[in-house]
């Protein structure tokens, strides 16, 4: 694998948790500026969720939820990944997504679920975040 030392290699891509708190959009922009082709992380298999959850539990400083690259751009429960990969796997927390008060359109990993399950959240909330890159 060609991933830098503190990145997690998985299925040909590299993943890294960033502990600074950013809004969803600022986090996606940070990932994109880090290196061309980088985005907030996308998930396609249950096994990836478990491996990422373990990695975040090991390396994340703090109890913050963690942004991933899923969002509801059209605000109608039609979810999209920022890397434009296909939506072939979802792992929502119980009773989610709910677009609570019609304000939640960005997706985070829930720290209380051990970073395994997903919640839709207000995009202006500040979370830690997970970038995905190809090196």
From Swiss-Prot:
Keywords, sorted A to Z: Calcium, Disulfide bond, Lectin, Metal-binding, Secreted
Entry keyword Calcium: yes
Pfam families associated with the record: Lectin_C
Protein's cellular compartments: Secreted
InterPro entries in the cross-refs: C-type_lectin-like, C-type_lectin-like/link_sf, C-type_lectin/snaclec_domain, C-type_lectin_CS, CTDL_fold
Domain C-type lectin positions: 10-132
Binding residue positions for Ca(2+): 96, 98, 104, 119-120
Keyword Oxidoreductase: no
Expression by tissue: Expressed by the venom gland.
Positions occupied by motif Galactose-binding: 96-98
Disulfide bonds: 3-14, 31-131, 38-133, 106-123
PANTHER family with a match to the protein in the record: MANNOSE, PHOSPHOLIPASE, LECTIN RECEPTOR RELATED
Subunit annotation: Homodimer; disulfide-linked.
Record-stated family: Belongs to the true venom lectin family.
Extra remark beyond the main annotation: Negative results: does not induce platelet aggregation and does not inhibit platelet aggregation mediated by von Willebrand factor or fibrinogen with agonists.
Protein name, as recorded: C-type Lectin CRL
Organism: Crotalus ruber ruber (Red diamond rattlesnake)
Lineage, broadest ranks: Eukaryota, Metazoa, Chordata, Craniata, Vertebrata
């Amino acid at each position: 694998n060609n991933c830098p030392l503190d990145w997690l290699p998985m299925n040909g891509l590299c993943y890294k948790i960033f502990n600074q708190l950013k809004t969803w959009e600022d986090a996606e922009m940070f990932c994109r500026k880090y290196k061309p082709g980088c985005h907030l992380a996308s998930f396609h298999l249950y096994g990836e969720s478990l491996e990422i959850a373990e990695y975040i539990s090991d390396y994340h400083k703090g109890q913050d939820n963690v942004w991933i690259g899923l969002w509801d751009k059209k605000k109608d429960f039609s979810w999209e990944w920022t890397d434009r990969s296909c939506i072939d796997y979802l792992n929502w927390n119980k009773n989610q997504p709910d677009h609570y008060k019609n304000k939640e359109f960005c997706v985070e990993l829930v720290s209380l679920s051990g970073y395994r399950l997903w919640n839709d959240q207000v995009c202006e909330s500040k979370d830690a975040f997970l970038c995905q890159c190809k090196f």
